[in-house]
């Protein structure tokens, strides 16, 4: 465990807010639209390349979703734009351990702010160990 690194989460991965897409503006296709509660429909365009790790930002906070195909991360989510050399599948398994719902900054509607999430102190193993851990959990 001596090769594990402790840093800000934002030093390991970067989140970005998803994109608005009203149901009336969708064109039927095979691209999943992923919201804080999971796949909420399909569209004919993607905004993010796979693999994808997406977390609930509004409403259903901290839920973690994984996409093996290109996808549209909805405005109610934060999605990982840069894994910074970390294994996406491992990050998918790791994020629930942080209990992200504790970082709610909303008053009437539960909300996560990526700036706060990036400041969480986290400890991650090197890539080789991430691969082994993800293989066992998959």
Residue positions per predicted region:
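Non-catalytic DNA-recognition/assembly elements of restriction-modification systems
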Residues: 1-35, 123-134
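A short beta-sheet element
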Residues: 35-97, 101, 105-108, 112-117
């Amino acid at each position: 465990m001596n090769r594990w690194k402790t840093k800000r989460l934002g030093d390991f991965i970067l989140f970005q807010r998803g994109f608005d897409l009203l149901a009336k503006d969708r064109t039927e296709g095979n691209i999943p639209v992923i919201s804080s509660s999971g796949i909420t429909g399909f569209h004919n365009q993607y905004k993010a390349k796979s693999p994808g790790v997406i977390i609930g930002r509004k409403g259903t906070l901290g839920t973690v979703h994984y996409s093996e195909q290109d996808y549209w991360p909805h405005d109610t989510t934060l999605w990982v734009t840069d894994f910074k050399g970390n294994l996406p599948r491992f990050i998918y398994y790791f994020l629930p351990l942080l209990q992200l719902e504790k970082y709610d900054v909303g008053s009437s509607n539960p909300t996560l702010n990526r700036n706060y999430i990036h400041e969480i102190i986290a400890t991650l193993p090197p890539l080789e160990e991430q691969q082994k851990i993800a293989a066992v959990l998959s």
